[in-house]
Amino acid sequence: MSGIRVKIIEKPLFNEREALRYAGCGNDAGDMIELLKKSFEEADKKLVYKVCFGEFPINTDGDVCDFGSFKAYSKNLSRNLSGCSSVLIFAATVGVEIDRLIARYGRISPSKAVMLQGIGAERIEALCDAFCKEYEEENSVKLKPRFSPGYGDLPLETQKDIFAVLECPLRIGLSLNDSLLMSPSKSVTAFAGIIDSREKQTIDKIR
């Protein structure tokens, strides 16, 4: 395992359609666009785009995923990491200010609070996508689709191990409570298998 690193990502492009979808708006959301724009304008300057991450060895055997520092038990994750000898483990957050805005408008403007929820969800997903793309480009590798605790049969308790090895509170101010909820709430932890060079060459030939 190499050392744990912290990276601040340049603000990803904002996808209005995705934010509206996360906010629960249907296809006919024309009347919500103005509220979305105003909400994003207020939230935008308060957001951060921080990631802490490390590369770990991975050995899979049935539902056991052995990362050296800890083990996770999931057939779905094991299948996802099949063919990889190393894995990128990361935690990402857009910061606590979006939570504060949501709480404030939850009291005075519920519709704006819902829109801010959608913006926060879009922003953290965009951050994860941007980070993974940047990692691939900087390291000349390909990553498998990211896989997070709580998805499929991967226990949410796996969060504890990720937080321990990445030192999330120290590095990016991300904490985990006894109910396994993250704070700030617009945060993600995930595994992304690093495709071995031989497999990458095969994929490139297929393309």
What are these regions (language model features)?
Residues 1-113, 191:
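Active-site helix-to-loop segments that bind/position phosphate- or nucleotide-bearing substrates
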Residues 49-56, 133-148:
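Flexible, glycine/charged-enriched surface loops at secondary-structure junctions
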Residues 94, 141-207:
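Short terminal or interdomain "cap/linker" segment that borders an active site or interface and mediates
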Residues 104-117, 145-152:
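Surface-exposed loop-to-helix/strand elements on domain peripheries
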Residues 111, 118-133, 137:
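Compact, glycine/acidic-enriched structural inserts
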